[in-house]
Amino acid sequence: MTETPPPPVQQLADERTAARAAKDFAASDRLREQIAALGWGARDSADGQVLTPLPPYPVFASVQDLPDRSGEPDARRCTVALLVDGWPQDVRTCVEALLTHAPSDVVIVLLDNGTPDAGDVVHELARHERVEELHVERAAGWSQARQALVRADVAAVHVLMDVSTVLEGDGIGPLLAALEDPAVVGAGWRGVDVVDGWLDFADAGPGPVEALLGYLLAVRRAAALAVPLPPKARFYRNADMEWSFLLREAGLGSLVAVDVPVRQDRHRGYHDSDPVLRDKESKKTYDRFLQRFRGREELRLPR
């Protein structure tokens, strides 16, 4: 049911419509701010101005508008970053398990990536002192959103975690312990090695691996800033493996898979995404990976 704006909001909206018709865009912007101050949002559409109640939390226009704290020193030990693309119950399950099992100094950051249905749950979960929230209006691709989370972080260790990954014990502490070795740049739950002439990957680990999957992947924040996630990767699939090789190519350290107590629930990114988009973007990423790394045997691990 559409909520009817109160008379003061409607009056400002009518004035804004007139200002836009007169091409007085400065007045239009000023009136939009006045409408927002009354708790309503004014959005322009092909059918005219649309008024909707604003949510009880700030919403950035896009991930480019999120705070950039990349120049700040480390201020905490670890952040677990969750990219929320919907499925609020999955988000709740993942976060509640983190709060139960992860070390008490680990902070959880949720990025509501332009979702129509998960923002309120993200806001509710952020009432917990260890949970922080970010909301954007326009959804971003996987790597773009993930790198924005890295830039907004101030932890020494940044953990990429998919909401389908659910802790059944402390799955974060062992990753942090692995990163105490200065020769290790990243630690994760699932590792893989190249097989079949670089045309496929096979499960590997525990121990040193050629690539880590992004279901649960801890990396030093400094490394994630120095070697960003592949910017052309709009979809998650294969982008984590491409990034793994980029980190190792840069000589920033080794990657290790660690046996941790987690389970994977339904992976929405794969099973519930548009299959045409999924296959197209996955192939583009893997083709880019092959073009850069195929034949680079110095990046292979002896088995």
Regions found by a protein language model. Give the residues of each.
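C-terminal, non-catalytic tails of nucleotide-sugar-dependent glycosyltransferases
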Residues: 63-75, 185-188, 193, 206-207, ...
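Short, acidic, metal-binding catalytic loop of nucleotide-sugar glycosyltransferases
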Residues: 96-105
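A conserved acidic beta->alpha catalytic loop
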Residues: 112-121
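Glycine-rich, basic loop-to-helix element that forms the pyrophosphate-binding segment
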Residues: 136-153
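Short beta-strand-to-loop acidic/aromatic patch adjacent to the donor-nucleotide binding site
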Residues: 155-166
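Conserved donor NDP-sugar-binding/catalytic core segment of glycosyltransferases
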Residues: 169-200
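A recurrent flexible, glycine/aromatic-enriched loop bordering the glycosyltransferase active site
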Residues: 200-222, 236
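Donor nucleotide-sugar recognition loop
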Residues: 214, 226-256, 260-262
